[in-house]
Amino acid sequence: TLNISRANGSQREQYDQVEQYVALGYDAVCVNLVDRTNASSMVDLAQSEEVPLVFFNREPVREDILRGDHVYYVGTDARETARMQGEAVLQSYAASAEKMDKNGDGILQYVMLEGEMGHQDTILRSDYVLQTIEDGGVKLQKLDAETADWMRSRADAIMEQWIAEMGDEIELVLCNNDDMALGAAD
């Protein structure tokens, strides 16, 4: 049996749902945490009944994952994907700096489309892509950043607004995921 529940942003409601599934003897419980820093009580509950607990999308803090023998996280490595994006920018810049640096000031003026506000992947992807580019010797200047909540349609609307406001001042568009990048390109 597969049951899907929504916590509607409530950590308490989410805990109650996990508690119910553990009490019903489910083979495993998968959780998209409301608050990634507050998983320990769920881990302890599942551990006490030896029910595997699989977290996805929001990675619990490391200490919570290590609390149990059957606690897992499934997701991307946000740092690595950000480094890869930064390295792609560096490769493009090395191949054609004059095309990217439209105004020739030696600084890439950028805008960034970010995922969900406060989401660890948003924070890590934003920080690590910038760090990778700057560590690669390219100077950056932020023109603007907006939350598009991982959505292509929102990214498209934000990008249209930026183009209307800033036009050719934008030399680089950074996005926290592929869907928002597609929206920016639309």
Regions found by a protein language model. Name each.
Residues 1-186:
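A residue-level marker of the well-folded mature domains of exported/periplasmic proteins
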